[in-house]
Amino acid sequence: MARIAGVNIPDNKHTVISLTYIYGVGRTTAQKICAVTGVNPAAKIKDLSDEQIEQLRGEVAKFTTEGDLRREINMKIKRLMDLGCYRGLRHRRGLPVRGQRTKTNARTRKGPRKPIRK
C-alpha cells in the first residue's frame, strides 16, 4: 500500500479512485491531480513507479487535506458560534443551518424523538 498524505492508499484500485480515500480529495480533484502529474487515471497504484507516486504526493500536498482541512472546517464553525450569528446559533442548538424546515423531518440533525412529558 502506498502512503500519501498520511493515508494508506489501496494498491488494487485505479489512481483516481485511490486518491479519493484522502479526506478533502474527491473525484474532480483526483482527476486534476492525475492530469497535472501526467499519471494515467485508469492505472492502478501498484503499477505506478516510485517516481510517479512521489509526484502524486507532491501534488496532493498543495491541497488542504486530512487533519488540516478538518481543523479548518471546525474553526470556521466555532467562529460562527462565537459571533452569535444565526448560523452559529443553529450550529450550537444542533438544528439545520441552511434554512430547512424543522416542523417535520430534520430528524438526523435534531436526534431521536423525545417523549412528551405529562
Swiss-Prot record:
UniProt record, GO biological process: translation
Q: Ribonucleoprotein: present as a keyword of the record?
A: yes
Tell me the GO molecular function terms. rRNA binding; structural constituent of ribosome; tRNA binding
Keyword Iron-sulfur appears in the UniProt entry: no
Write out the entry's keywords from A to Z: Ribonucleoprotein, Ribosomal protein, RNA-binding, rRNA-binding, tRNA-binding
A GO cellular component annotation in the UniProt record: cytosol
InterPro entries in the record:
Rbsml_uS13_C, Ribosomal_uS13, Ribosomal_uS13-like_H2TH, Ribosomal_uS13_bac-type, Ribosomal_uS13_CS
Which residue stretches belong to region Disordered? 93-118
How does the record describe its quaternary structure? Part of the 30S ribosomal subunit. Forms a loose heterodimer with protein S19. Forms two bridges to the 50S subunit in the 70S ribosome.
Q: Which PANTHER family match?
A: 30S RIBOSOMAL PROTEIN S13/40S RIBOSOMAL PROTEIN S18, SMALL RIBOSOMAL SUBUNIT PROTEIN US13M
Q: What does this protein do?
A: Located at the top of the head of the 30S subunit, it contacts several helices of the 16S rRNA. In the 70S ribosome it contacts the 23S rRNA (bridge B1a) and protein L5 of the 50S subunit (bridge B1b), connecting the 2 subunits; these bridges are implicated in subunit movement. Contacts the tRNAs in the A and P-sites.
Family (UniProt) = Belongs to the universal ribosomal protein uS13 family.
Q: What is this protein called?
A: Small ribosomal subunit protein uS13
